[in-house]
């Protein structure tokens, strides 16, 4: 048997983790001692060595990123503003047109709405744009080894995913050097973790490999396969925005048939009707009685098999609806006084770009590029205060 890879590891680690030579020795020992567990799962020494060749340290960013998951920590209106907006709709329609034949074939074979698949692609990798930003990607075996070594809460998960990742490499679906993904090991256009890839991966383009990194058809078909196998009901929606009767908050979380909800006074905005009156739906009021209300059907919970966050599933459903021609929510979120809404965020970016301060995409995401532009604008105008987007800033931009 080929000897298992042993190498020097220079650890650049977070607080509470060992540093310097001690971290190097401990991580090196972990890599060595994990091999027997991988071997029991059928991983050869050749595959193991190839996967860890050139790895000289744990991934220093993984544990930091593990502390922040926006779908669970961001206010729902901010989360949705950045993911369901005119930019993501425009880009989605363009991407769908480029991949229409594949989408038609996938929709026909798996019985999953193409707009849902496009929305997932957007939410997961911005229609693949994230995959070209190498500075944001992680080498999956290294990221998972880092979690297994240094994150006790996620060690079991990481070990299971690492073995699955090694199986993917061993099967020849992807070269080790090309197995990139998120800090948690989510991979490719549609961000599948390794175990889910092994269960649901599809070779849709017929080249003999399930390649969700380079093949859009493979990635979208793999997403469709997951939804299909978890009970997606073709021809039915994920849910409805509804106008609730007064004092409906006590009903939040209850499940009834659509017909029963109608009898209680729930209706769709614009008095549009419900298609399936016998369908069961759960009332959700994510921001309480002061915000939008939704009746969520079985397909909403199928989307949650992809990502367990309600915010995520709501974003997928809302974006899919707008890709299909919907105009979006009728009711407004109860934003704090002075908070920007989605249109105002777009306007700030648009005006900064028109004035020559901002050169990026007008996508409503007021990130570091936008803040640099705001700082330059404020300096030029002699404005005091922090370079943050605000209604006051927008007033200055409008002058």
Where are these regions (language model features)?
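Bacterial N-terminal signal peptides that target proteins for export
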Residues: 1-9
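An acidic, Gly/Ser/Thr/Pro-rich helix-cap/linker signature
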Residues: 24-109
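Sec-exported extracytoplasmic/periplasmic mature domains
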Residues: 32-48, 53-60, 108-111, 122-129, ...
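Acidic helix-start/capping segments at beta-turn-to-alpha-helix junctions
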Residues: 48-72, 121-125, 135-142, 241-246, ...
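Acidic/His-rich structured neighborhood in mature extracellular/periplasmic domains
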Residues: 77-228, 238
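Cell-envelope/ECM-targeting effectors and their regulatory/trafficking segments
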Residues: 142-150, 164-168, 253-399
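Flexible, glycine-rich surface segments
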Residues: 176, 180-305, 313, 331-332
């Amino acid at each position: 048997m080929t000897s298992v890879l042993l190498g020097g590891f220079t650890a650049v680690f977070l607080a509470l983790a060992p540093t310097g030579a001690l971290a190097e020795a401990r991580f090196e020992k972990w890599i060595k001692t994990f091999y027997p567990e991988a071997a029991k799962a059928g991983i050869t020494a050749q595959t193991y060595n190839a996967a860890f060749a050139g790895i000289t340290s744990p991934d220093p960013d993984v544990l930091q990123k593990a502390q922040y998951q926006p779908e669970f920590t961001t206010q729902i209106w901010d989360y949705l503003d950045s993911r369901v907006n005119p930019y993501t709709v425009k880009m989605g329609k363009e991407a769908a047109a480029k991949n229409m034949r594949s989408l038609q074939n996938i929709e026909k074979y798996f019985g999953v709405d193409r707009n849902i698949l496009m929305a997932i692609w957007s939410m997961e990798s911005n229609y693949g744009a994230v995959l070209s930003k190498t500075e944001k990607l992680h080498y999956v075996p290294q990221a998972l080894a880092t979690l297994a070594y240094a994150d006790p809460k996620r060690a079991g998960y990481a070990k299971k995913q690492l073995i699955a990742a090694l199986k993917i490499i061993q099967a020849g679906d992807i070269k080790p050097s090309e197995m990139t993904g998120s800090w948690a090991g989510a991979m490719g256009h549609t961000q599948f973790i390794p175990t889910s890839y092994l269960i649901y991966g599809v070779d849709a383009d017929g080249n003999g490999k399930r390649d969700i990194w380079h093949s859009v058809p493979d990635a979208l078909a793999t997403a469709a396969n997951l939804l299909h196998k978890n009970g997606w009901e073709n021809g039915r929606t994920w849910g409805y925005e509804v106008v609730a009767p007064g004092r409906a908050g006590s009903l939040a979380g209850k499940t009834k048939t659509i017909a029963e909800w109608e009898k209680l006074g729930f209706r769709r905005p614009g008095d549009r009707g419900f298609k399936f009156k016998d369908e069961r739906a759960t009332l959700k009021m994510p921001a309480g009685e002061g915000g939008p209300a939704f009746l969520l059907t079985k397909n909403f919970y199928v989307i949650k098999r992809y990502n367990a966050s309600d915010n995520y599933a709501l974003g997928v459903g809302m974006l899919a609806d707008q890709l299909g021609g919907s105009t979006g929510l009728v009711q407004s979120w109860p934003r704090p006084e002075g908070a920007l809404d989605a249109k105002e965020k777009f306007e700030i970016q648009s005006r900064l770009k028109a004035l020559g301060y901002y050169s990026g995409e007008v996508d409503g995401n007021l990130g570091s590029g936008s803040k640099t532009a705001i700082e330059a604008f404020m300096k030029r105008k002699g404005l005091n205060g922090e370079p943050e987007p605000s209604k006051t800033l927008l007033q200055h931009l409008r002058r």
